[in-house]
Amino acid sequence: MKNKSVEMLIEGAKEWGIFLEMFHVEHFQKYYALLLEWNQKMNLTAITEESEVVIKHFLDSLSVVKSGKIKEEEKIIDVGTGAGFPCIPLKIVFPKLKATLLDSSKKRITFLEEVINKLGINEIELIHGRAEDIGKDIKYREQFDLSVARAVAPLNILLEYTLPFVKVDGYFIALKGREIEEEIENSQRALKELKGEIEEVKEIKLPYSDIVHHLVIIKKIDNCPTKYPRRANAIQRSPL
């Protein structure tokens, strides 16, 4: 990456209270190079310009630390990780996080295997599968301190895919856009059914841009009923 983009990454991360060393920067540079290389073979991201990737992918992912819920050595699952956002940037900065990245695309999982090998990332598991299936598996169900998702699905749908992974007293953090009030209003039934409650909604302004988004911080207050998550067609046809 050019010096300007590196400076944006370093200074932008400081706004989240993150102080990057050069080895962190080198990891982000390798990640960016792999993203560009593999994006020519498959659809990973429409955002490829260097400074845009720094702002809209790297700094956006790192904004999760503003939730106050990122703690070293805790177990985190990234549901629908895509090209690895937000969990790969978080693992670069917090290498002791025990991370699981879940995606339904085998091609994207293959890309992520290359990323973690080239970056030498440890304590990370990649799963090719669907959240509604893996969320029923006792190996993963209610096993995580934290789940995160940057997916574009409405919050009430995301909750059914993500909360079954979270331990009681753990958290789900949804990275959502500027307009969030209606989504929250439409999620009250899902929160009640899935045993979650909104603890806080934090407004985040991305550095070097006019982009505003929100972190919706949801606490798991009890065990999810075993009937959730339902099959994908049921979730889409009649969301909670």
UniProtKB/Swiss-Prot annotation:
Task: Give the UniProt entry's GO cellular component terms.
Answer: cytosol
Q: Does the keyword S-adenosyl-L-methionine apply?
A: yes
> Where does it live in the cell?
Cytoplasm
UniProt-listed Enzyme Commission number(s)? 2.1.1.-
Q: What is this enzyme's class at the first EC digit?
A: transferase
GO MF annotations for this entry? rRNA (guanine-N7-)-methyltransferase activity
What sections of the sequence does the record tag as coiled-coil?
none
One Pfam family this sequence matches: GidB
What are the UniProt keywords, alphabetically? Cytoplasm, Methyltransferase, rRNA processing, S-adenosyl-L-methionine, Transferase
Residues reported to bind S-adenosyl-L-methionine: 80, 85, 103-105, 131-132, 150
Q: Does the keyword Zinc apply?
A: no
Role summary = Specifically methylates the N7 position of a guanine in 16S rRNA.
**Record's family?**
Belongs to the methyltransferase superfamily. RNA methyltransferase RsmG family.
Q: What is this protein called?
A: Ribosomal RNA small subunit methyltransferase G
Q: Which organism is it from?
A: Thermoanaerobacter sp. (strain X514)
Q: Which gene encodes it?
A: rsmG
